[in-house]
Amino acid sequence: PEWKWEHIAMDFVVGLPKTKTNHDAIWVIIDRLTKSAHFLPINERYTVDRLVDIYMREIVAQHGAPVAIVSDRDPRFNSRFWRSFQECVGTKLNMSTAYHPQTAGQSERTIQTLEDMLRVCVIDFKGTWDKHLPLIEFAYNNSY
């Protein structure tokens, strides 16, 4: 990557306790150059359309459309709608494979760090961990 937010990685942290606002997962989106990240609270059952809306508002509106995205083979990232949308904005999709998991290694390390931070918050904040996610994101992005 030559410019920030040009190449990104993304994955989901799932299986979290449901919050009062019905969030039970976090969409982790990482800039592969600067290692900075966005932690977006979602519900695992959100449609791809809803995820595209969030992505447009939280990523594209702030950073522009990336040149390339590395992600796992989650069905949401493999859907026709997601692929067509990314093609329209000129973003290349790179799926990590079971044989080459290092392609998603950066997002996996970020997710592990996030999960460690979240464990403390979930214990302390119970059903409101999503309200504290911006502070966790700030702490993560200012810790290196």
Regions found by a protein language model. Give the residues of each.
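Integrase module of LTR retroelements
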Residues: P1-Y144
